[in-house]
């Protein structure tokens, strides 16, 4: 039953209009979706937000993209799922708890309620019955359950490894979470620490993960993903074909045992340069480094300094390359020559074998290291017979196709592929190496030394204590029937470590195997675990018996995923892995979670600041400054309103609270209404590109909606009384119908290709066409008006649903065709596009002199006759006799006199 609507006001009042629309949709439970096999399904989802408590216009843009897609596809007959939830675990809640002395659970749930209250006025068609918060026990129970399944399959395992340690957030960071050597949340310089933790064997899936982003012939290739994202994942997975081999040695520890069994292994993709090795470098944690440091205090001190830094390739690529000699030597595997071993701060223990061969003549990093420390440089590859030059050393490394080995004994004179094969064969013959494929991708460490996350379901049993004959059971998985391991929600972190370690109620437990006193694991899971499968839980959020059920089979894989490019490597790669692991555990039947991916652009805004004597910047809100513009409208200066003194133009930047250039949706909605906020964020530019916020642009969108309201209410009686018969329509009505259906065809095309900025401009052109049509007061012309306005309202509805809904009700469309929620997308009337009259450009001696209207069926002779009879020709020919008439069909007529 339709909710009553108030009689429309003569003025556009978005507050009342939008409140009435919300009441109507709520009464109908309009956005609840159920599985329906009689219709094609479409699952469109935005990446779930972290509940920071504040919605910004970037959120509005992202969710409006999703909403426009969902509403349009529903009109096209699809059963569309558009859910929303909350990525609710994580460090910000703990940091806020420390600052505000409030439990993270309370802070998080308060923020969820606040953000939800900010979303609802936007009219987003989320199915809130499927809402998920990852901090709810009925969600993270399944994180724990699946972790135990992965443990059973050997995909989850425990090991001790050198990791990235964030000293501020006091937790381990995955390599992907270290940005320019700093923690992605805290911004603090990371350190290296050796620490035990749980890992997920994502590398077991490296081949499949790579194939679906790198090989178009792969059955699961992600054709619907942006090439940029596929390339980012391909690079991160980083498949490398090369040779793994060992440098033998006689280095022994204090007990006389060979360190590392007398072999120091390395991997190289350039085995053709093996005879150019003049040194080797090992990681600070390598057994040879540890052995040498035991008797060398200076080396030991250097190794300690190396720990003050992260373990990511990106960080090591940019930091200064430093090293210390160990005094140790290994043997070259082919020549037998002694090779000095150095400790290098740029070598990672977690990558390969923690050692690299140094070939200064043919590697940029090795060259810089050798020049710095006076190590020999030996050319072993040349191009076109040229010899090594310090000015052109890069050429010998980069040009694999033309390079030929030299100074390499019996391996000289070989091309790159032949040399690699020969070196691999020679090493294999000695049992020292062979060809191997390696990966840049590393297993995913999920242990975090933080409180606000999913508890890892492990119990540590050490037995019954001193004197007991019970040796303990070690690490024992929590029995499935005891899940979930509940996270206590009343703890308040104080910044001194994980509060779970101090909670006796959580920590102390009986061993499930032997009953002896034991302790729970206090590490929690990386929050990327939570976001790796939430989109499947949306499909069946009330499932108590299973992680996912048959409803997941109906909706998944997702048809369209929407989110920022910043998630290309972290979230999107983990989600792909998680899906494949679920498949291999028999939980899902598909290989990839997201058929199509859309990466929206950022919303930008002007920024303004003033620097104090110490160089610290104070950022001003746009409302706090007056800006001066040049004659082209470009900002050239600004002053603070508070004191009239200059402030600096920071330029157009991403909206950021730290720079005070965030535009609050609440402010825009209060001033202009939600439809204006939605409309401008779409009109500002292509959705996949960044766009700048503009107050004047928002005002322009508001003026358009006000014009639409004024025009539609003025035409109310004519539209309500109109029929659908276009017989005897006037020329103006015929032209209007053609314009309307041409625009409808274009708008439909733009919806299909997600070009929502041109959808909005198409809606604006539709209103222009309706306003400018000089229609007669006849039944046929009123029918053309009714049709055109109805098409406009449906075209605009996904972008500005409130005003479209109100006018649809008021103008009588709902009474005749049902609720706009259920209205089908309008079809293009091909007959309306057929022209019975066309307009040609009229030229005289090649100069534009007017326009010529002729029947669309007119042949060349009829067009010539019309041109010769036109008053424009008589005016500009000035009595001269036409010599020639040139007709360009469908475009122009040129009369030569």
From Swiss-Prot:
Keywords: Aminoacyl-tRNA synthetase, ATP-binding, Cytoplasm, Ligase, Nucleotide-binding, Protein biosynthesis
Enzyme class name: ligase
EC number(s) recorded for this UniProt protein: 6.1.1.4
Catalytic activity: tRNA(Leu) + L-leucine + ATP = L-leucyl-tRNA(Leu) + AMP + diphosphate
Gene Ontology molecular-function annotations: aminoacyl-tRNA deacylase activity; ATP binding; leucine-tRNA ligase activity
Pfam hit, one: Anticodon_1
GO biological process, one term: leucyl-tRNA aminoacylation
Positions with a binding annotation for ATP: 657
Protein name: Leucine--tRNA ligase
Originating organism: Methylibium petroleiphilum (strain ATCC BAA-1232 / LMG 22953 / PM1)
Lineage of origin: Bacteria, Pseudomonadati, Pseudomonadota, Betaproteobacteria, Burkholderiales
Gene symbol of the encoding locus: leuS
């Amino acid at each position: 039953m339709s909710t009553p609507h108030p009689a429309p006001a003569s003025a556009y009042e978005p507050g009342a209009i939008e409140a009435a629309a919300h009441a109507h949709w709520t009464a109908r439970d309009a956005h609840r979706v159920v599985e329906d096999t009689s219709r094609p399904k479409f699952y469109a989802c935005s990446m779930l937000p972290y509940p920071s408590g504040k919605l910004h216009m970037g959120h509005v843009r992202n969710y409006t993209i999703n909403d426009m897609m969902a509403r349009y596809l529903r009109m096209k007959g699809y059963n569309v799922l558009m859910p929303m939830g909350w990525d609710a675990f994580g460090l910000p809640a703990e940091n806020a708890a420390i600052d505000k002395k409030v439990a993270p659970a309370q802070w998080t749930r308060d923020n969820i309620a606040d953000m939800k209250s900010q979303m609802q006025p936007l009219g987003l068609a989320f199915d809130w019955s499927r809402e998920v918060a990852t901090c709810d026990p009925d969600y993270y129970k399944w994180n724990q359950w699946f972790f135990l399944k992965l443990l059973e399959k050997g995909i989850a395992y425990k090991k001790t490894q050198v990791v990235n340690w964030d000293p501020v957030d006091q937790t381990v960071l995955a390599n992907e979470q270290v940005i320019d050597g700093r923690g992605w949340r805290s911004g603090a310089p990371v350190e290296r620490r050796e620490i035990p933790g749980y890992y997920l064997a994502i590398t077991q899936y490296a081949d499949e993960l790579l194939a679906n982003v790198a090989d178009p012939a792969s059955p699961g290739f992600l054709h619907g993903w942006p090439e940029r994202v596929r390339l980012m994942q391909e690079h991160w997975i980083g498949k490398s074909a090369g040779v793994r081999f060992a440098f033998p040695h006689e280095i022994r520890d204090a007990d006389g045992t060979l360190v590392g069994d007398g072999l120091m292994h390395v991997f190289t993709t350039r085995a053709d340069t093996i005879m150019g090795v003049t040194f080797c470098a090992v990681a600070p944690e390598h057994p040879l480094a540890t052995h040498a440091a035991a008797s060398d205090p200076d080396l030991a001190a250097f190794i300690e300094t190396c720990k003050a830094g992260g373990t990511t390739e990106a960080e090591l690529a940019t930091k200064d390359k430093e090293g210390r000699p160990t005094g140790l030597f290994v043997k070259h595997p082919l020549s037998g020559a002694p090779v000095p071993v150095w400790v290098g701060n740029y070598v990672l223990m977690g990558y390969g074998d923690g050692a690299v061969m140094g070939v200064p003549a043919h590697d940029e990093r090795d060259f810089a290291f050798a020049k710095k420390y006076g190590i020999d440089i030996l050319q072993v590859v040349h191009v076109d017979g040229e010899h090594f030059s310090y000015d052109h050393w890069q050429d010998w490394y980069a040009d694999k196709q033309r390079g030929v080995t030299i100074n390499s004994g019996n391996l000289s004179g070989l091309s790159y592929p032949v040399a690699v094969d020969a070196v691999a064969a020679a090493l294999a013959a000695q049992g020292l190496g062979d060809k191997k494929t390696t990966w840049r991708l590393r297993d995913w460490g999920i242990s975090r030394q933080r409180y606000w996350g999913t508890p890892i379901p492990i119990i540590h049993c050490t037995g019954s204590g001193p004197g007991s004959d019970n040796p303990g059971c070690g690490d024992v998985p929590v029995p499935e029937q005891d899940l979930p391991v509940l996270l206590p929600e009343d703890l308040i972190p104080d910044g001194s470590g994980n509060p779970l370690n101090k909670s006796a109620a959580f920590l102390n437990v009986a061993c499930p195997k032997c009953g002896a006193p034991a302790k729970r694991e206090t590490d929690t899971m990386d929050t990327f675990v939570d976001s790796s499968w939430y989109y499947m839980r949306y499909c069946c959020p009330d499932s108590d018996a299973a992680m996912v059920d048959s409803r997941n089979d109906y909706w998944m894989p997702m048809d369209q995923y929407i989110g920022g490019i910043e998630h290309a490597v972290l979230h999107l790669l983990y989600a792909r892995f998680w899906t494949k692991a679920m498949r291999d555990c028999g939980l899902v039947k598909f290989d990839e979670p997201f058929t199509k991916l859309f990466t929206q652009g950022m919303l930008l805004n002007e920024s303004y600041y003033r620097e104090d004597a110490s160089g610290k910047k104070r950022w001003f809100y746009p409302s706090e400054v007056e800006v001066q513009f040049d004659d082209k409208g470009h900002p050239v200066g600004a002053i603070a309103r508070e004191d009239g003194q200059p402030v600096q133009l920071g330029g157009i930047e991403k909206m950021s609270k730290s720079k005070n250039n965030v535009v609050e949706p609440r402010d825009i909605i209060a001033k202009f209404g939600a439809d204006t906020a939605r409309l401008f964020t779409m009109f500002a530019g292509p959705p996949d590109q960044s766009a700048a916020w503009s107050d004047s642009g928002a005002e322009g969108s508001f003026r358009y909606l006000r014009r639409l309201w004024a025009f539609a209410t003025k035409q109310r009686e004519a539209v309500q009384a109109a029929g659908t018969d276009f017989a005897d329509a006037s020329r103006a009505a015929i032209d209007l119908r053609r314009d309307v259906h041409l625009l409808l065809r274009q708008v439909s095309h733009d919806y299909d290709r997600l070009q929502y900025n041109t959808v909005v401009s198409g809606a604006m052109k539709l209103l222009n066409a309706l306003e400018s049509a000089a229609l007669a007061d006849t039944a046929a012309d009123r029918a053309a008006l009714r049709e055109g306005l109805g098409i406009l309202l449906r075209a605009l509805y996904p972008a500005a649903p409130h005003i479209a809904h109100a006018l649809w009700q008021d103008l009588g469309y709902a009474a005749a065709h049902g609720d706009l929620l259920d209205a089908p997308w309008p079809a293009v009337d091909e007959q309306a596009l057929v022209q019975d009259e066309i307009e040609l450009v009229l030229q005289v001696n090649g100069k534009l002199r007017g326009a010529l209207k002729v029947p669309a069926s007119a042949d060349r002779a009829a067009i010539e006759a019309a041109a010769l009879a036109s008053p424009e020709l008589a005016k500009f020919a000035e009595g001269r006799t036409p010599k020639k008439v040139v007709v360009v069909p469908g475009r122009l007529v040129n009369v030569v006199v």
